[in-house]
Amino acid sequence: MGKIIGIDLGTTNSCVAIMEGGEPKVLVNEEGARTTPSVVAYTKDGDRLVGQIAKRQAVTNPENTIYSAKRFIGRRFEEIQEEIKLVPYTVVAKGNDCAFKVQGKTASPEEIGAAVLAKLKKVAEDYLGEPVTEAVVTVPAYFNDAQRQATKDAGRIAGLEVKRIINEPTAAALAYGMDKKKDEKIVIYDFGGGTFDVSILEVGDGVVEVRATNGDTHLGGDNFDTVILEWLITEFKKDQAIDLKNDKMALQRLKEAAEKAKIELSSAQETEINLPFITADQSGPKHLQTRLSRAKFDQMTEDLVKRSMEPCRKALADSGLKASEIDEVVLVGGSTRIPAIQKAVKDFFGKEPNRSVNPDEVVAIGAAVQGGVLAGDVKDVLLLDVTPLSLGIETLGGVMTTLIERNTAIPSKKSQVFSTAADNQPAVDIHVLQGERKMAGDNKTLGRFELVGIPPAPRGVPQVEVTFDIDANGILHVSAKDMSSGKSQQIKITAQSGMSEDEIKRAVADAEGHAEEDKRKAEAATQRNNLDNLVYQTEKLIKDSGAQLPESEVKSANEAVAEAKKILENKSASGDELKGAFERLQNLTHKLTSELYKKQGAQPGAEGQQADAAEGGEASANKGGDDVIDADYKDVN
C-alpha cells in the first residue's frame, strides 16, 4: 500500500506533508518553499501555470490568473455575487454553478483546486520516488456538505482518491496533540487566508475529540488585504483625482502591495508603499507613494478582528466550557501573525496564545498524521470530529425537524419514523435541509428525492423510516423506506451548491437573532398541525357515527369545523387564533364522543378508539411512540 499524503488546500497557500519513520514531514516544492501559492494562471500560449510561477506573472496577466478559488468552490453562481466584485478575473455562470473565464474557455473552481492538488501530488511523488494515489485533504470546519463534496471532486480530477476529508482546526489539533500524554482542553483559533474557524477540543493520550466548532467561511487574510487596497485607491484618488478601480493591472499591483504591507506591519510599526508608474494620464505617468502605520491598519481592520470573536463565544457556549477552563489557545493560519488578532485572542480567553506550532504547516501535518492512521502506519491515535451544522427534513407546517444536531460526533447515523399528511398519499417528497433555524424555508436545501409506491392508507397510518448517515468526511447520505411495502429510495447529497456568506450567517448566528420570531412560527406551526388533525378526526367521527348523535350537536360541530377550515386557509393566522379554534372544536368534539359513549354503553374497544380520535392533533402527535410524527410531504406527480 502506497503513502496516504496529507494536503492543506488553502485559500492563499497550500501545503503537503507525509509520515516518514513515524514522524510527519512537510515537503519542499520545486521552488524550494514549504508552501505553494494556491494560484493558477493560463497564458496566451495555452500553458497552465501553478503556484509561485503563476503568482509572479499575475500583474501582467490579471484576467487569466485565478486566486482564492476556494471562496467559490461548491457554490452556485447566484451565491457569489459579492466575491465577484473583489477579483480582477471574470466569473461566469455555468448552469447553476460558477466558473472562471480564462483565455476564451472556462475552468471550474474544482479544476483550479485540482491543479493545485496535482502540483502537491507531484511534489510528494518526486520526494518518495513512487506514484501517489491517495490523500487526506483538509477543509474549513464550517464548509457545508456541497463544499466538502466539491473538494473531493477536485481530488478526483487531480488523480487522487480522497480517503478522508477532515476539518482544518481538527487537523491542527491532531498535529499539536499527537504526543500529549496529559489531557488538555484546547482551542484551535484558525485564521487563514480566506476562512476563519474555531474549534474546542480535548486532546491527550492519542485521542483528539472535538467538543464544538464554529466559524465564518468568508473571513480571512484576504479581507485585510482588501481593506488596505481600498484605502490605497481612496488615497490615490484624493491626491491625483484618478480612480484605479477599473484598471485591472493596477488593481493586481495594489493587491500585492496590500498583502506585502500587511505582512510587514506584523513586525514593523510602519511600512512604506511605493508603486511607481501605477497609471498615467495626459500629464504623464503617475506614482503611488504613501506610508501606513500599524495603528492606522489596526483602526481600519478593527471590525474584522471583532468578527472572529463571535464564533469563539458560540463555540464556547456549545462546548459547555468557560474561557477559564481552556488550557491552551493554539494559533493556526498565517493571519494569526497580525498583532491585533493575537491581542484580541489573549483578551478573550485570558491567556497568552500558544505559538508552538508553525501556523502555515500544522494543518498539513495533521492531515499527514490522519493519513498515517488510515494507512495503519500510526497506531493509538483516535480522531473524533463533529458536524458543524444541524441536518434534518421539512415536516408538516414547513418546520425543519432535525435528525442530526450540530456538533454531533461523526460518523453518525440517525433514523426517525414519519407518516403521511393526506389520505391515500402515494408518494412522499423528502426535502433535506442543513441549518439552525426552526422553519425549513430559512435553512439551506441540500437536496430532494421521492419515495413512491406507498400503498393506499389513511393519513398517519403509513410508516416511512428516514435515515441520515453522515460519514467521517462529513458527507451526508439519506434514505427513506416504507415499512409496510419495504420500498426504499436513497440519495447521496452531491455538490449542487454552497452557502453564501448571508446563508452561513443565518445558519447559526441569525438563529439567535431571530429566536423570538422562530419561536412564534414554530408554535403557530404546531397549533396548525393540531387543528388540522382535529378537523380530520372530527369529520371522520361525524361521517362514521353522525346518525347516532343529536342533530343539534352535529350541526354545532360542523359549524366549528367550517370555522377551523377557514382559519387554516389563512396562512398568516397566529398561534393564538389557531389554538382558540382548536379549543372550541375540541370542546364540541368531546360532547359528541360523550353522547356516543352514552348511547353505546360502557363497552371497551371502539368507544375508546373514538375518544382517542376525538382528542385530535395533540393526542395523535404524541401517541404511537416518540419516533412517529406527521410529515409535510406533497404528492409528486
From Swiss-Prot:
Q: Which GO terms describe its molecular function?
A: ATP binding; ATP-dependent protein folding chaperone; unfolded protein binding
Q: Which PROSITE patterns match?
A: HSP70_1, HSP70_2, HSP70_3
Supply the Pfam families for this chain: HSP70
Q: Which UniProt keywords apply?
A: ATP-binding, Chaperone, Nucleotide-binding, Phosphoprotein, Stress response
Q: Where is this region: Disordered?
A: 596-637
The organism sits in which domain of life? Bacteria
Q: Where is the composition biased (Low complexity)?
A: 600-621
In-chain residues carrying the UniProt-annotated modification Phosphothreonine = 195
Q: What induces it?
A: By stress conditions e.g. heat shock.
Entry-linked Gene3D superfamilies: 1.20.1270.10, 3.30.420.40, Actin, Chain A, domain 4, Substrate Binding Domain Of DNAk, Chain A, domain 1
The UniProt entry, under InterPro entries, shows: ATPase_NBD, Chaperone_DnaK, Heat_shock_70_CS, HSP70_C_sf, HSP70_peptide-bd_sf, Hsp_70_fam
Q: Which family does it belong to?
A: Belongs to the heat shock protein 70 family.
**Function according to Swiss-Prot or TrEMBL:** Acts as a chaperone.
Query: What name does the UniProt record give this protein?
Result: Chaperone protein DnaK
Q: Which organism is it from?
A: Bdellovibrio bacteriovorus (strain ATCC 15356 / DSM 50701 / NCIMB 9529 / HD100)
